Regions:
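Pre-Walker A adenine-sensing motif
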Residues: 1-5
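Walker A/P-loop
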Residues: 7-28, 224, 228, 252
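Conserved Walker A/P-loop ATP-binding site and its immediately adjacent core
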Residues: 17-24, 37-60, 230-233
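Conserved helix/coil segment N-terminal to the catalytic DExD/H
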Residues: 72-102, 113-118
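Conserved Walker B
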Residues: 103-109, 235
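Post-DEXD/H (motif II) to motif III coupling segment of the RecA-like Helicase ATP-binding lobe
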Residues: 109-171
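Conserved interdomain linker/interface between the two RecA-like ATPase lobes of SF2 helicase motors
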Residues: 150-226
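Conserved helicase motor "Helicase C" RecA-like lobe of SF1/SF2 P-loop NTPases
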Residues: 229-253
Length: 255
């Protein structure tokens, strides 16, 4: 209600991953279309896969809950246009700044990045809504610059206590790796430094030993898992090592 008052034309939804940020957006869009079925909407997402998933979700909810045909898709003339940051950063000037009544930014912690910020500030929507689980950036840039003042109303711990999310079980494995010399650029670690430091045969073997002892013992029920590696090459090395130890594994990447 606060975001809908005349003096508030922007807002930010800050909720842990898996607690329904996209569902909140879709529910709000449905309510707005009930009031105005000619509304033009832009939803910005970071990846092609998220674009595909969001198109499916929005279409499904609109078909089931709204008795008005709305053209939803990735085409420029869509009534609800769902596109990636990169696509819109290339083509945003092909649009009029007043083309969209409502703009939503998924993974909105990226909104203060120069390229995406330029896109957002080009348009003049009646409503700008950001969705994120991580409103605190490592470079300390404030999302309030884009979305105005906001409050985080549900923490990860609270979501678990309310049975919205499953409890987290964490196991910490000590190794002799020293990360103090790995450079950090304010956003992420340098990949070259990580590869020199983290990729070590002894450490890779430790991963295998821990998995064999606690997760893939023959007396235990089958478990599946995901291992994040430093690089594609590292992923292939770890997969080969697991396979050599009779643990079913496959290396996958975005390449």
């Amino acid at each position: 209600a606060r975001a809908r008052s005349p003096e508030h034309r922007s807002g930010l939804v800050v909720l842990p991953t898996g607690t329904g940020k996209t569902e909140i957006l879709i529910a709000d869009l449905i309510e707005q279309y009930k009031k105005n079925n000619s509304l033009k909407v832009l939803i910005l997402v970071p990846t092609k896969q998220l674009k595909i998933d969001t198109i499916k979700k929005v279409n499904h909810r609109f078909e089931n809950e709204l008795h008005v045909k709305v053209f939803i898709g990735e085409e420029k003339n869509s009534q609800i246009l769902i596109q990636t940051y990169s696509w819109m950063s290339r083509y945003y000037q092909n649009f009029n700044s007043l083309d969209f009544d409502y703009i939503a930014v998924d993974e909105a912690h990226h909104a203060v990045a120069p390229t995406l910020q330029k896109v957002i500030q080009y348009f003049n929507p009646q409503m700008l809504l950001g969705l994120t689980a991580t409103d605190k950036r490592l470079d300390e840039k404030s999302l309030a610059e884009i979305f105005g003042k906001y409050e985080s109303n549900l923490t990860l711990v609270e979501a678990i206590k309310q049975d919205i999310l499953a409890p987290i079980k964490a196991f910490r494995v000590k190794s002799n790796i020293d990360l103090s010399e790995v450079r950090f650029n304010g956003k992420d670690y340098y990949s070259t430094d990580l590869q020199k430091t983290v990729i070590a045969p002894s450490r890779d073997q430790l991963i295998v030993d821990v998995l064999k002892k606690y997760f893939v013992d023959k007396t235990m029920p089958f478990k599946s898992g995901l291992i994040f590696c430093v690089s594609v090459v590292h992923a292939k090395k770890v997969a080969k090592l697991l396979q050599d130890n009779e643990i079913s594994c496959k290396a996958v990447s975005g390449n």
